[in-house]
Regions:
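Nucleotidyltransferase catalytic core that binds NTPs
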Residues: 2-158
Length: 158
């Protein structure tokens, strides 16, 4: 799809059709953004999604393109996130499976968007949105993608 195609869009329904969603995702409705590596998607991410969904009723999950990245932590980061064994398609498939198993439908409650390796979000004052960190409790915070990847390696699945 060429970017010029977006110039003729007159409604979120038309935009939803371009993304092949059967149930229109309302592009004008307030929406929560979740940005991450999701290496891999796990139950803690699903709990975060469910919390985010309560805020507006729809969520855009942004998948950072980080497959195979080594080295530099990036702008303003103190710790490099270099263990990125899953490519974009595998990550997106994992998100769809995890949320599908929990009863959520892409295009209704959420959409997935691949984005560059975003390492900083800059904004000015009065921009009309907030940054929210959700405390999901000790049990959820103990779920660790690092531990999941280590176990997958031990079992020869990665």
């Amino acid at each position: 799809m060429d970017m010029k195609d977006f110039g003729t869009i007159t409604s979120s329904l038309e935009l939803s059709k371009m993304f092949e969603y059967e149930n229109p995702f309302d592009f004008k409705k307030p929406t929560v953004q979740m940005l991450g590596r999701w290496q891999p998607w796990h139950d803690g991410h699903t709990k975060l999604f469910e919390k985010a969904l309560t805020l507006t009723g729809q969520v855009v999950i942004m998948v950072r393109e980080v497959y195979g990245i080594e080295g530099d932590a990036g702008a303003g980061r103190t710790v490099a996130q270099t263990d990125n064994p899953f490519g974009e398609i595998a990550v997106i498939d994992g998100i769809k499976k995890g949320l599908g198993d929990a009863g959520y439908e892409e295009g209704r409650e959420y959409m997935i968007m691949a984005v560059p390796n975003i390492v900083d979000i800059s904004y000015g004052r009065g921009v009309g949105y907030t940054f929210t960190e959700h405390d999901l409790g000790k049990d959820v915070h103990e779920i660790s993608a690092t531990k999941i990847r280590a176990k997958m390696r031990e079992e020869g699945k990665l």
